[in-house]
């Protein structure tokens, strides 16, 4: 069915509408302080109340507070007429001045919030994070398009089946009455200026054909429509395709699931306010739109319900509709509103949008049941516009700190990622060697920083030395556990000596061979755990060096592979050297030796410590006689004294061996080996062969860093307002 476009000025009002507002006591005070230009579009309640709620802008005094000036009594009708004309002129000047002040303060407080998010969305920030938005969803024929038409003042595509086939960003901007209507539609790299409201419908249809094709398919690609008019609220909405249950001809059979998937992707974001449109003449509990909103917002914290078609409700069900709007049936934190927009018959009869708003108010004013909703500001398009603007601005202010934090974090990560793709391979042969030299130089610098424990960190990264220290702390705990194990095993070993090996010696004489055996056995138990620590450290160091190759050579697969091969070869060599060194250390440890003065100092300290404790709590002597307790205690003192020195030695020596061979020598040899690549001139072109995806990734990351930097600057500029 073809629709008649409205070629009149958007939102042009019938002449008697001003009188209608004056007749309504609720709007009487407002009418006195608003110019006819603001009144004629039906949005007069938006100009003042929005400022009250969102920016606390003081309004001119109400009618009760009006100031009256004494007027001397006139003697002639002509003088009285002149006085009336003069008073009317002054009144109009006062109204215009008040309007100008309100508009300027409104522009300073409200418009920047919405413009900020619009500018971030225009930069493409939604590719990186979610932005505050109001998404409009509803089943087919729910009245969704009619609401958007009433808010925007323009006709949108209508027809059978799925008409909205792409997300439509509808940016409404209120401008002074002195300026003319203008619009702009943008999609992909196309941007078209619109000179008249009548051009909007065809412009949207053409844009959808380009983005989604001409066969009824849908697309998740955004189309942006900007409308600047004196007769629209300051608001940005995202219109989504209506939820379909049956595919039309030429449409995929799963078109319904495609639409639901697209809708769910957008309304799932916690930054999105979901505007759910439901007709009054259907069971609200069964509507697919509300069901989807409840799935992503179970508590209803960011869902606003809009009831349409109140003129089609069955007689006797009005109270049920009122209970829904009063939030008594399916509670939503943001509540419900009800509106009456143009129907298909109204469009066929060429009813203008302005007249439809006029008829909507008359409907609610005269309805015996629904008039109470008008008194509560829960009905009509103007009140809906006011509600949506306030909700959006409050939501933007609430989420700005989170948005700034997310942009900062994503920007930092993107800059770090871009370092891998800093620039492409030179085309001039003489520059290639210098380019490779720079790459290897930067890589070697990072290796040196790792060796010194001074590498640059991003986010929650942990320095390699911090990881190695944990491994060496584990080694220290193993030594303590081994020393405790020795003390517990001494009584049984001494009993074995008494029972099997003591010959003509008197009881109480310490056998040095037994002492040596105990020491050697416990030292031997530490050798394999030391090798485990070595392997753990090798793995951590290798992972760090491989991470550096991916950081510097990610887009040069041959160079990256060459560096990884060198890391693997050097790793094996250094691991073998370190293991041999550790095993030699334990071979020496099996020689029981200590300087006399050091040993005697440790022995005195050990005996003093033991005497200061209740020896019965230290060791159980149930397996030996009391007469042997003294020389067992003596053996414990000697072994503990020796292990004190040996543990100190091993606690430092094993980590030093590992750090020397596996970190320092590994890193130094890797740097030297990478420099050798510069001498292999015949491999130069092969080493610098760039991956096919590298240039694409570089461009992507550069664009991302660019838009995030601009977005961050926008937020900084906004915070200075």
From Swiss-Prot:
The keyword Mitochondrion does not apply. InterPro entries: Dynamin, Dynamin_GTPase, Dynamin_GTPase_CS, Dynamin_N, Dynamin_stalk, G_DYNAMIN_dom, GED, GED_dom. The keyword GTP-binding applies. This is Interferon-induced GTP-binding protein Mx. Residues 340-343 are annotated as: G5 motif. GTP binds at residues 138-145, 239-243, 308-311. It holds the Pfam family Dynamin_M. One of its GO terms (molecular function) is GTPase activity. The gene is MX. It comes from Anas platyrhynchos (Mallard). Transmembrane segments: none annotated. Belongs to the TRAFAC class dynamin-like GTPase superfamily. Dynamin/Fzo/YdjA family. Residues 163-165 are annotated as: G2 motif.
């Amino acid at each position: 069915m073809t629709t008649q476009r409205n070629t009149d000025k958007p939102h042009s009002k019938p002449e008697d509408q001003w009188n209608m507002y004056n007749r309504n006591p609720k709007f009487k005070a407002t009418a006195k302080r608003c110019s006819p230009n603001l009144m004629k579009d039906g949005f007069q309640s938006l100009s003042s109340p929005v400022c009250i709620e969102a920016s606390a802008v003081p309004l001119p005094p109400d009618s009760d507070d009006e100031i009256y000036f004494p007027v001397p009594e006139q003697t002639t009708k002509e003088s009285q007429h002149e006085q009336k004309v003069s008073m009317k002129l002054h009144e109009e000047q006062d109204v215009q001045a008040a309007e100008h002040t309100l508009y300027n303060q409104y522009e300073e407080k409200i418009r920047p919030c919405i413009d900020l998010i619009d500018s971030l969305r225009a930069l493409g920030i939604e590719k990186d994070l979610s932005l505050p938005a109001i998404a409009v969803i509803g089943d087919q024929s729910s009245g969704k398009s009619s609401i958007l038409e009433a808010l925007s003042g323009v006709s949108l595509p209508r027809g059978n089946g799925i008409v909205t086939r792409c997300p439509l960003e509808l940016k409404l901007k209120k401008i002074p009455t002195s300026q003319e209507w203008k619009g702009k539609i943008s999609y992909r790299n196309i941007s078209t200026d619109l000179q008249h409201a009548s051009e909007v419908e065809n412009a949207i249809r053409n844009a959808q054909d380009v983005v989604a094709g001409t066969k009824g398919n849908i697309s998740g690609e955004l189309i942006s429509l900007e409308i600047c008019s004196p007769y629209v609220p300051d608001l940005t909405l995202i219109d989504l395709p209506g939820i379909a249950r049956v595919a039309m001809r030429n449409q995929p059979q799963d078109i319904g699931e495609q639409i639901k998937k697209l809708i769910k992707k957008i309304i799932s974001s916690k930054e999105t306010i979901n505007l759910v449109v439901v007709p009054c003449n259907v069971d609200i509990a069964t509507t697919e739109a509300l069901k989807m909103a409840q799935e992503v917002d179970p508590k209803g914290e960011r869902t606003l319900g809009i009831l349409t078609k109140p003129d089609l409700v069955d007689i006797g069900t009005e109270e049920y509709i009122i209970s829904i709007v009063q939030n008594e049936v399916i509670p939503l934190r943001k509540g419900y509103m009800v509106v009456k927009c143009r129907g298909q018959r109204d469009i066929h009869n060429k009813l203008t949008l302005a007249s439809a708003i006029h008829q909507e108010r008359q409907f609610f004013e005269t309805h015996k049941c629904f008039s109470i909703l008008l008194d509560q500001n829960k009905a009509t398009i103007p009140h809906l516009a006011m509600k949506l603007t306030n909700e959006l601005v409050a939501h933007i202010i609430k989420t700005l700190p989170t948005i700034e934090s997310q942009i900062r974090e994503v920007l930092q990560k993107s800059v770090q990622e871009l370092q891998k793709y800093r620039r492409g391979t030179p085309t001039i042969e003489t520059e290639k060697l210098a380019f490779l030299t720079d790459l290897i130089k930067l890589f070697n610098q990072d290796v040196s920083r790792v060796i010194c424990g001074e590498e640059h960190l991003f986010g929650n990264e942990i320095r390699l030395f911090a990881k190695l220290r944990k491994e060496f702390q584990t080694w220290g705990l193993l030594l303590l556990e081994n020393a405790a194990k020795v003390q517990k095993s001494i009584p049984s070993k001494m009993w074995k000596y008494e029972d099997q090996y003591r010959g003509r010696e008197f009881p109480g004489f310490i056998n040095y061979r037994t002492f040596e055996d105990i020491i050697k056995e416990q030292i031997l138990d530490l050798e394999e755990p030391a090798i485990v620590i070595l392997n753990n450290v090798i793995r951590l160091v290798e992972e760090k060096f491989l991470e550096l190759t991916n950081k510097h050579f990610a887009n040069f697969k041959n160079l990256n592979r060459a560096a990884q091969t060198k890391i693997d070869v050097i790793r094996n060599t250094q691991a073998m050297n370190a293991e041999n060194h550790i095993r030699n250390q334990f071979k020496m440890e099996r020689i029981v030796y200590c300087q006399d003065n050091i040993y005697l100092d440790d022995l005195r300290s050990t005996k003093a410590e033991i005497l200061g404790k209740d020896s019965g709590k230290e060791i159980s002597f149930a397996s030996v006689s009391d007469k042997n307790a003294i020389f067992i205690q003596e053996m414990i003192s000697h072994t503990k004294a020796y292990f004190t020195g040996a543990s100190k030695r091993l606690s430092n020596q094993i980590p030093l061996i590992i750090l020397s061979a596996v970190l320092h020598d590994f890193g130094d040899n890797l740097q030297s080996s990478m420099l050798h690549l510069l001498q292999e001139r015949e491999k130069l072109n092969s080493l610098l062969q760039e991956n096919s995806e590298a240039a694409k990734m570089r461009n992507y990351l550069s664009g991302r860093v660019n838009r995030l930097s601009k977005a961050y600057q926008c937020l900084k500029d906004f915070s200075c307002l």
